[in-house]
């Protein structure tokens, strides 16, 4: 099962019972798995790990494989007897995984995004009937457009603001809409 896990800057997990050191490609093993009690913990939803390791500048966030005995709860938390970190993710990659998760599970996401957003230095995510988001160079703009009479996702657009193909500024479904656009204006269009 593909899951997500956060760590401190040394890839040590300090939540739970003691410290545990992980490594990319190295399988960690536990005797038992019970969510919020014992085992190796992770989340199904990418941004779920930010509740535990939320510093995008220093914490490490990975996509992992959970295997062995697996126990899940209704909040998307996973405990397993085997956990292998597969790859470190940039904050931008983590946000893209979150957008894909929301597209597949529009009603199960614990995260709430407004119809208008500005970047946090890494990404901006907007969700709604007419989403708009702004990004500076080096960030990712993610737009999740909902159907008119539903919260299911109709369209997902991702813009890597590189300053060449995609310039800094505001984006809506369909692309670039301007360099300067106030939040109030974007919410009312």
Predicted regions and their residues:
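Short, glycine-biased loop/turn motifs at secondary-structure junctions and
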Residues: 1-189
């Amino acid at each position: 099962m593909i899951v997500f896990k956060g760590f401190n800057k040394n890839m040590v997990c300090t939540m739970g019972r003691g410290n545990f050191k992980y490594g990319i490609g190295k399988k960690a093993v536990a005797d038992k798995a019970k969510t919020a009690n014992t085992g190796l913990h992770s989340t199904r939803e990418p941004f779920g790990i930010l509740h535990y390791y939320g510093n995008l500048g220093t914490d490490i966030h990975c996509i992992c494989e959970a295997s062995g005995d697996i126990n899940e709860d209704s909040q998307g938390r996973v405990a397993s007897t085997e956990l292998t970190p597969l790859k470190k993710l940039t904050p931008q990659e983590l946000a893209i995984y979150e957008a894909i998760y929301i597209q597949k599970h529009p009603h199960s996401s614990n995260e709430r995004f407004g119809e208008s957003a500005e970047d946090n230095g890494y990404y901006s995510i907007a969700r709604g009937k007419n989403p708009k988001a702004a990004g500076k160079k080096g960030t990712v703009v993610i737009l999740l457009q909902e159907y008119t009479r539903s919260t299911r996702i109709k369209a997902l657009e991702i813009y890597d603001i590189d300053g060449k193909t995609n310039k800094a500024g505001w984006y809506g479904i369909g692309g670039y809409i301007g360099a300067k656009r106030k939040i109030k204006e974007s919410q009312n269009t």
